[in-house]
């Protein structure tokens, strides 16, 4: 795969190690529709769309330039994907996904990423899964504790190079109400 990048987007010089670890940890198949939340220039969404071409893939990011690059990268790599400029889940209201993939923007702060986790839990279809990668030293254990308040199942599926890949399933029934308090 070939990716266009630019200044002002995350990991513009090379594939982020966390993204690489997340993609390698995914199972043999994932269910669609798929959301790449905080897509940046589209690495995760494009890789998933290329690996499973029959899946409906949506990519969302707050950064307009990142969205433009994600569209370009999907086109370059022959992947059909919808790309939305969205502050978190704002442009996705009412949409539901079977799989949500995320390399969260840690530098945005805990309040922002925890809001994204809560909104993700509320945006899953029944049986859906939220997959994310986070470095241990950047808060993976505390993120797991928070995720356990949203999901019945939170598992570490991979630990590699200081990165933890988490898979969360079975959002609590009251997750949509809980997102109002984040």
Can you describe what each PLM-predicted range is?
Residues 17-102:
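Conserved SAM/SAH cofactor-binding pocket of Class I
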Residues 135-150:
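Conserved class I S-adenosyl-L-methionine
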Residues 114-126:
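A short glycine-rich, Lys/Arg-flanked "PGG" loop and its adjoining helix->strand segment in the class I
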